Amino acid sequence: MSMAKQRLKLVIPGSHGLNIAAVLETPELEPKAYVLYAHCFTCGKDNMAASRVSRGLVAQGFAVMRFDFGGLGASEGEFADTNFSSNVQNLKDCSDYLREHYQAPSILIGHSFGGAAVLATAGDIKEVAGVV
């Protein structure tokens, strides 16, 4: 098992003009794959479930990006102005960022509400091989 090599705090430009706060954790060695994690309704990228899942996957050699949906955590915007479509777009924006700067996610993980957003997004990310 490898420990996290890096924990990068990222600011991803959202397609709606609002920045998305994200964290990318990578293992010591070349990642087996990149994972994009979507949190539950009104939670955030740093909640206990997201952090534990991320640490576990990094220990197994995966790189994991988790982010705050718009209006939550450190992401810009007002929660009251968000909806399911804007959350799906946040996922696509994060996927595009990974593709451009690292490697597109091949695994999407969603917790509760994040799971619904992941299912709605999976077909639009051609590299996705698995959804949890």
Q: What is the predicted role of each segment?
A:
Residues M1-E30:
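N-terminal cap/lid segment of alpha/beta-hydrolase-fold proteins
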Residues K32-C40:
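Short beta-strand element of the alpha/beta-hydrolase
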Residues Y37, A63-M65, I109, V132:
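Conserved Rossmann-like nucleotide-binding pocket used by diverse enzymes
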Residues T42-S54:
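The serine-hydrolase catalytic nucleophile loop
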Residues K45, L72-Q103:
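Catalytic nucleophile-loop/oxyanion-hole region of alpha/beta-hydrolase
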Residues S54-E76:
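Conserved alpha/beta-hydrolase
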Residues C94-V132:
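Primarily recognizes the serine-hydrolase "nucleophile elbow" in alpha/beta-hydrolase
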